[in-house]
Amino acid sequence: MEASTDAVHAPTVAGISGNATVGAYSVALSGGYPDDVDLGEAFTYTGSGGRDLKGTKQNPKNLRTAPQTSDQTFENSLNAALKRSAETKKPVRVIRGFKLQSPYAPTEGYRYDGLYTVEKAWMGTGLTNGLLVCRYAFKRVRGQDPLPVRDLERERMEMEEE
């Protein structure tokens, strides 16, 4: 929510902000898709859509955790925004969230981690369900401060000691 009110990343739930005409303004890496790979200076990001968000009163769906039940497409406006960014190479703001399983994720909340370019956009098969997903390769723009890095092994050991 703070990223939205601070105008760093407008959507409060969606991981992609932008449109098909100008491209993406920002993305949030928050652990929503198991196919995402975060290497810090570069990462692979999974697109939007393909999730059943209807739910019922007895079994409500969560926007972030609903399972993917259909293929993603580049017709989805958010996926089209990232595809456009791959074409223009206009930098995109990146926010990392604490739920992301990565040494580059903050320990709490969300953090602005700088500008990245979308180097490539393609369709691929999801790792967990065999459905098609939109994939994007991001690369960090040079000349920015180094990313903070967590020691996940030390954090695990400290949690076990408690």
Regions found by a protein language model. Give the residues of each.
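Compact mixed alphabeta submodule
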Residues: 104-161
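Acidic, glycine-rich low-complexity segments with interspersed aromatic residues
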Residues: 1-111
